[in-house]
Amino acid sequence: MSDYKSEFLRELSWRGFIKDTTHKAELDAYCAQGNPVAYVGYDATADSLHVGHLMTIMMLRILQRHGGKPVALMGGGTTRIGDPTDKEKTRPLLTDDQINANIAGIKTAFEPFIRFGAGPNDAIMVNNDDWLGKLGYVEMLRAVGMHFTINTMVKQDTVARRLAAEQPYSFLEFNYLLMQSYDFLELFRRHGCRMQLGGSDQWGNILGGVDLIHKTEGGEAFGLTAHLVTTSSGVKMGKTVGGAVWLNADRKSPYEYWQFWRNTEDADVGRFLRLFTDLKQDEIMRLEALQGTQINDAKKVLADETTKLLHGEIAASEAYTTATSALYSVGPVESLPTYEISKGEWDISPSTVALLK
């Protein structure tokens, strides 16, 4: 059992989210006092979020369930640079029109999971271009740059790995840490946000923001990271033979989404039930105890619950019916969904069976 006093942190803990935190005791006290404000940043590199983003979305959902206020930060400014974290080469830059179109598409992905509005714990969505776009270069250097050392920045995993491999690491990318840290400072000032959530790959960037707030405002801020999710076979969460598993319905149908979760590997079912559903702990433990072919029952529950969260109960029920018809119907199959698989995708598939699951 977790030793956290905060119900928010206790739930994150038993569900298996928490990897690292700053100032654990102080963070717990802040969350336990009620109405904590926390943010997650999302760069607008595509017009939809994908399953890989669900980890942090679910963290915001749990925060709101326990009375906290979620802040979804759109990276209209930082996307102009591109997050270099865990990237082996520089990303191509997007135009402002592309970034704005992507932000418009991303907004719809949040709505099934968190409630937006003007209430004390209603979520808000903000765009860091509102301050980064107005920040002059000299002002940025004076306000932020003076608080960071090159010595520290080159020790970050992504920077060190690129330099060791003699891969280019542009000055543009080098500024990403400063910009993300400044985001935290602005959210602290504008919205009283004292906590940043993210994947473990963002740990260095989060620490930068926590430190900047302490140095410039004398304020107390916190960071919490979650484990990066991979399947038991080592595949990055949300990636399939056909590409990313998108959250927007126009990019991935409810049936495809349901089928993705139904095809979860046996060893991952319990973990994914904890991370990606609202099921209570006792029910999850019951499903985790299933053995043999009964694991398929747990997989169906996982597929139903995750699809219900994103697309609604009716869409989840229809997806289940379609999948069942595909398995057991002896009638015509013209009405079933069809998908084209390129030769390249076929060639990289670990097996034909993986494509036919």
Where are these regions (language model features)?
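NTP-dependent nucleotidyl-transfer catalytic core
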Residues: 1-202, 210, 217-222, 235, ...
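A generic alpha-helix structural signal
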Residues: 9, 31, 103, 107, ...
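Short runs of predominantly hydrophobic/aromatic residues within well-ordered alpha helices
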Residues: 137, 171-184, 206, 254-257, ...
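Conserved nucleotide- and phosphate/pyrophosphate-binding catalytic cores
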Residues: 213-357
